[in-house]
């Protein structure tokens, strides 16, 4: 949550270029959100969607469905 609330994906201290951001986003969110276990368990905290959507808007990737 600290990484999300602190908006560290926009902070040069943590991410030096787009590749760093992409690795963070992919490792932290995408794989988790699309994992079969996650979908079966339904563990998504609805409060996180705000942060996920904000991260998507700041990236060049397509939005999640």
Swiss-Prot record:
InterPro entries on file: DUP/COS
Pfam families for the chain: DUP
Protein name: Putative uncharacterized protein YCR102W-A
Organism of origin: Saccharomyces cerevisiae (strain ATCC 204508 / S288c) (Baker's yeast)
Lineage: Eukaryota, Fungi, Dikarya, Ascomycota, Saccharomycotina
């Amino acid at each position: 949550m600290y990484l999300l609330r602190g908006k560290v994906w926009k902070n040069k201290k943590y991410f030096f270029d787009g590749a760093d951001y992409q690795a963070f986003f992919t490792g932290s969110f995408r794989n988790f959100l699309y994992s079969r276990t996650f979908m079966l368990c339904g563990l998504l905290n609805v409060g996180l969607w705000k942060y996920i959507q904000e991260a998507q808007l700041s990236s060049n990737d397509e939005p999640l469905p």
